Amino acid sequence: MSIVPAVVELEKIRDFFYRLAEARDRLREAGFRHPAEVPLAVGTPLVKLGFIAMLRRGVIMDVTNVEQAQVAEEAGAVGVMVLDKLPYDVRKAGGVARMADLKIIEEVMDAITIPVSAKVRIGHFYEAVLLEQIGVDLIDESEVLTPVDEQHHINKWLFKTPFVNGARELCEALRRISEGASMIRSKGEAGTGNVAEAVKHFKAIYGAVRDLTAHRDDEEYLRDYARRCQVPLEVVKLTADMGRVPVITFAAGGIATPADAAFMMWLGADGVFVGSGIFKSQDPERRAEAIVLATAYWDDPEAVAEAQKMVSEKASMMGIDIRALKPEELLQTRGV
């Protein structure tokens, strides 16, 4: 994409977020204010979206300590996501999964130069407050951790730090954007090493986008879609006009090989999150480098082939067959 269309696209997104912010302010003036609202600095939409845009064609890797974060940085990752446990271990351990220790997050921030992100539980406003307080670059309101609110997500407009949220289909993505998310990722099924669910979710999202674009001149159709999704009509119109999800959208959930990463980019992802696929493998350093290469050069089959040769299937993480999981064991159904 050349610089002029990219700037025009970014300005459209900025204007949309400003309109949503104005609507929020009108509601506040009318008295619709959360009684426990904590005053926070509000980052401008342009700053939030501009930072996220710089991550395109990159890989954000899940890490649990400084050593893994340094491996990610050396491999060329555009960022790391700090967790207490990798998604595979979260799934195996059971119990309640919470935000990582703030001390560990700060140690990672001190040790590397690339952006540092961390996960909070869905609906846990104050975990997000703490992450913003210590200065993380991106907050992931994640279904991988145990939700504290099954009905409501965090009001992300109250934060200056950008948020990323997961989605399985377009309505879910647009609801999160309307709440202030600056970035969307496919949910997939984290911790399985099986990319099938991420593929299904990305196809569902962009199949719906194409349908909206085909009806972009049909006001009644767009209005009905907005009503069904429970989102502002403006966000639906913006999606239809742009022909894509209005914010940067990464693939996530089960990516374990360079080929997986390249495939998700081919489906329309702007970049990828890799969770357990790297550090639950037997060749994390080489695999991290290979996935970064395949993501950056996904449209060059020769480069992707070279990346795939860097890893061995025998060293890949032991995957989990999603069909063997019980409905209550699925992480993707949390927080819709």
UniProtKB/Swiss-Prot annotation:
<feature type="binding site">
    <location>
        <position position="254"/>
    </location>
    <ligand>
        <name>D-ribose 5-phosphate</name>
    </ligand>
</feature>
<keyword id="KW-0456">Lyase</keyword>
<feature type="binding site">
    <location>
        <position position="62"/>
    </location>
    <ligand>
        <name>D-ribose 5-phosphate</name>
    </ligand>
</feature>
<dbReference type="GO" id="GO:0008615">
    <property type="term" value="P:pyridoxine biosynthetic process"/>
</dbReference>
<dbReference type="InterPro" id="IPR033755">
    <property type="entry name" value="PdxS/SNZ_N"/>
</dbReference>
<feature type="binding site">
    <location>
        <begin position="275"/>
        <end position="276"/>
    </location>
    <ligand>
        <name>D-ribose 5-phosphate</name>
    </ligand>
</feature>
<feature type="active site" description="Schiff-base intermediate with D-ribose 5-phosphate">
    <location>
        <position position="119"/>
    </location>
</feature>
<comment type="similarity">
    <text>Belongs to the PdxS/SNZ family.</text>
</comment>
<dbReference type="GO" id="GO:0036381">
    <property type="term" value="F:pyridoxal 5'-phosphate synthase (glutamine hydrolysing) activity"/>
</dbReference>
<protein>
    <recommendedName>
        <fullName>Pyridoxal 5'-phosphate synthase subunit PdxS</fullName>
        <ecNumber>4.3.3.6</ecNumber>
    </recommendedName>
</protein>
<dbReference type="InterPro" id="IPR013785">
    <property type="entry name" value="Aldolase_TIM"/>
</dbReference>
<dbReference type="InterPro" id="IPR001852">
    <property type="entry name" value="PdxS/SNZ"/>
</dbReference>
<comment type="function">
    <text>Catalyzes the formation of pyridoxal 5'-phosphate from ribose 5-phosphate (RBP), glyceraldehyde 3-phosphate (G3P) and ammonia. The ammonia is provided by the PdxT subunit. Can also use ribulose 5-phosphate and dihydroxyacetone phosphate as substrates, resulting from enzyme-catalyzed isomerization of RBP and G3P, respectively.</text>
</comment>
<dbReference type="Pfam" id="PF01680">
    <property type="entry name" value="SOR_SNZ"/>
</dbReference>
<feature type="binding site">
    <location>
        <position position="191"/>
    </location>
    <ligand>
        <name>D-ribose 5-phosphate</name>
    </ligand>
</feature>
<dbReference type="GO" id="GO:0042823">
    <property type="term" value="P:pyridoxal phosphate biosynthetic process"/>
</dbReference>
<keyword id="KW-0704">Schiff base</keyword>
<comment type="pathway">
    <text>Cofactor biosynthesis; pyridoxal 5'-phosphate biosynthesis.</text>
</comment>
<dbReference type="InterPro" id="IPR011060">
    <property type="entry name" value="RibuloseP-bd_barrel"/>
</dbReference>
<keyword id="KW-0663">Pyridoxal phosphate</keyword>
<dbReference type="GO" id="GO:0006520">
    <property type="term" value="P:amino acid metabolic process"/>
</dbReference>
<feature type="binding site">
    <location>
        <position position="203"/>
    </location>
    <ligand>
        <name>D-glyceraldehyde 3-phosphate</name>
    </ligand>
</feature>
<comment type="subunit">
    <text>In the presence of PdxT, forms a dodecamer of heterodimers.</text>
</comment>
